[in-house]
Amino acid sequence: NDYDLRRTIRGLVLSDAYARDSQWPEGERPSPVYFAVARPRPLTPNQYGSALVFAAADPEQLAKPKTPEDLAKRLADLEKRGENLAKRFDRPDDTFQVSVDEALYFSNSDQVQNDLLGEGGKLLGRVLKTEGLAKRLEVAFLNTLSREPSPEETETLNHYLAARNEDEKGAWQQVLWALMTSSEMRFNR
């Protein structure tokens, strides 16, 4: 095929194997010996630290770099901050469970409040500047989980935010905290 990568990639992407899902949709899961579905794995400390820092970043700061060098510098800075955050997390093993220390750190740490849930130059600031609740939820979900919210999630969060409209910033901090500490964020699927 004269090393036609476009043709090869197209063949892979359109294959039945590529179209399969790695999560079991319903019913009883098959035995692990069949390798029918992927096992969720916890992210390594560096992966999780970087994922949190990238999720907390203002998406507009990454969307419009002045030069490629500016973007590379910004990404390197975010990765370095992720490495610093990673020191707080346990290295996962086969029997990994989120530690009590990690849960308490996310619940009580000033670093989490300032670095991940702060307003200036962060996702929270961008969400609060965005017009319309649906668009705000979309920005929050795309930045943290790389997907749009489901209709059920949208309905639940609409009720949650409506009940806390007197402290909009605090309510959105809680929403972002919940997304960043969710199992969907912590585990590789």
Predicted feature locations:
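An acidic, gly/pro-interrupted, aromatic-rich
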Residues: 6-7, 14-150, 174, 179-189
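Amphipathic alpha-helical segments that form the core helices of the histone-fold
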Residues: 1, 155-165
